[in-house]
Design a protein with these regions (language model features):
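A glycine-rich, hydrophobic/aromatic-adjacent loop/helix-cap motif
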Residues: 1-162
């Protein structure tokens, strides 16, 4: 049995158990390049149907001994499928950073260096639907959410690539 600590879009309403991850800090720090089409992934369109030449940001966690991150722990049956979804991240064992023994390893996804470089290179924006989904998930679990993005928040439509 394996578990994943969700600190962003994995913290969906009605899924998982709220817990705090000690020694980590949530940041806006990972991005995908919207100019590149990757089979099996996604890109975004603006309201006019155009494909903005931007990087689209997502949440990340970074080590910070003085911090802690609220999120949810989810039981996961297929880690390989989740690894494919979280292609901008590396899966790391954070079991020791939780004050609960769940009977199996607890993983979190931390940003890959290339995804962090895309975020820094920009121009970088946040998709409004992603931000609202994360806020709703945290509210449903009675958790506070932060930090708010210090980036433009745009109405973008997600297109999944086959």
């Amino acid at each position: 049995m394996a578990f994943v600590f969700g600190y962003g879009s994995l913290a969906e309403p009605g899924a998982g158990r709220p817990l705090r991850l000690a020694g980590w800090r949530r940041v806006w720090g990972v991005a995908m390049d919207n100019r590149v089409t990757i089979p099996g992934y996604k890109y975004f369109l603006d309201g006019a149907g155009g494909r903005p030449a931007v990087c689209v940001a997502f949440l990340d966690v970074v080590p910070d001994p003085a911090a802690g991150v609220d999120g949810v722990v989810l039981e996961v049956g297929d880690l390989d499928a989740l690894d494919a979804r979280e292609r901008n991240y590396a899966r790391v064992d954070v079991s020791a950073a939780l004050d609960h023994d769940l009977g199996g390893p607890v993983w979190a996804y931390t940003g890959l260096e290339e995804a962090r470089k895309r975020f820094a290179a920009g121009p970088t924006v946040v998709q409004r639907a992603y931000l609202e989904s994360v806020r709703a998930g945290f509210a449903a679990h009675g958790l506070g959410f932060g930090p708010e993005p210090a980036l433009p928040v745009l109405d973008l439509e997600r297109v999944d690539v086959v």
